[in-house]
């Protein structure tokens, strides 16, 4: 059997598909890649905030819905908006490091004033503005290679990226991992997900064999927070869960650049209940501080 996998045509996306494909090969399943151009690819110089929701996912998911592919593979942080009701999560791979990193000559505490840090994430911008208001941020688009090239050419004095991206690309840049209390990661950062059609029971059963349950539980808890509070790649909300045994450890943060709220939770339970509880805590604190998301 050969499974058709739809994904963006970028280098990082291809690596992510191959990571999942290797898991399939180990259980005797072959795969082929269907390259898809997304809105984010077609408008690669536009700020993400101007492109709306689903810019990394819509066209890829449509290929599955239209029967051109069997599975859509994404960085799970890119699909925080509601998934099409005809699709569902078939599997996730074991999570890579979920952290944000700073690529710069100095660590965050020692950065000079009035330098420019490249990031297109409103979450990262606001967290940085809260911690270091004297530092400037500037939108940066393009793949990781392009961003690093701009940094090395001194167009930016630093970059904030996802650590998982560098790991998957096998890049050896020196970087500083950012504290999760200062830079709580985007929900589902570091997770690769496979979506399929709900009706495809045969393929669904295959993907159960490669699913990493603890990672999926962490992802679902984080998504419950985002669903309750409202968020995604255009929102300044960070949330991270770690599951150890039956225990969930979670942290969620929100910042408008002037104020910052962080809440946490530690208890056993199911992902949806724990995530919803953390989301309610965050909403309550946001209301107390007169912050409207």
Curated annotation (Swiss-Prot):
Disulfide bonds: none annotated. One of its GO terms (molecular function) is hydroxymethylbilane synthase activity. It comes from the Archaea. Signal peptide: none annotated. GO terms for biological process: protoporphyrinogen IX biosynthetic process. The porphobilinogen subunits are added to the dipyrromethane group. This is Probable porphobilinogen deaminase. The lineage of its organism: Archaea, Thermoproteota, Thermoprotei, Sulfolobales, Sulfolobaceae.
């Amino acid at each position: 059997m050969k499974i058709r996998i739809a994904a963006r045509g970028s280098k990082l996306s291809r690596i992510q598909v191959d990571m999942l494909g290797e898991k399939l090969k180990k259980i005797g399943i072959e795969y082929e890649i269907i390259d898809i151009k997304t809105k984010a690819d077609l408008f690669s110089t536009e700020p993400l905030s101007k492109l709306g929701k689903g810019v990394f996912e819509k066209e890829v998911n449509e290929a599955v819905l239209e029967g051109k592919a069997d599975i859509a593979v994404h960085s799970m942080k890119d699909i925080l908006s509601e998934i099409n009701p005809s699709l569902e999560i078939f599997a996730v791979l074991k999570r890579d490091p979920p952290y944000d990193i700073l690529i710069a000559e100095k660590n965050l505490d020692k950065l000079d004033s009035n330098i420019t840090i490249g990031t297109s994430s409103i979450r990262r911008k606001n967290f940085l503005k809260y911690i270091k208001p004297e530092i400037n941020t500037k939108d940066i688009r393009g793949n990781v290679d392009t961003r690093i090239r701009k940094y090395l050419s001194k167009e930016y004095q630093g970059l904030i990226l996802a650590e998982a991206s560098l790991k998957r690309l096998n890049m050896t840049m020196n970087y500083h991992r950012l504290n999760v209390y200062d830079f709580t990661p985007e929900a589902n950062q570091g997770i690769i997900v496979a979506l399929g059609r709900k009706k495809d029971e045969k393929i669904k059963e295959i993907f159960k064999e490669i699913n990493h349950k603890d990672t999926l539980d962490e992802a679902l808890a984080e998504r419950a927070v985002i669903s309750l509070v409202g968020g995604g790649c255009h929102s300044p909300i960070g949330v991270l869960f770690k599951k150890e045994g039956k225990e969930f450890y979670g942290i969620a943060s929100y910042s408008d650049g002037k104020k910052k709220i962080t809440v946490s939770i530690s208890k056993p339970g199911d992902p949806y209940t724990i995530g919803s509880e953390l989301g309610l805590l965050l909403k309550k604190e946001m209301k107390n501080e007169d912050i409207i998301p």
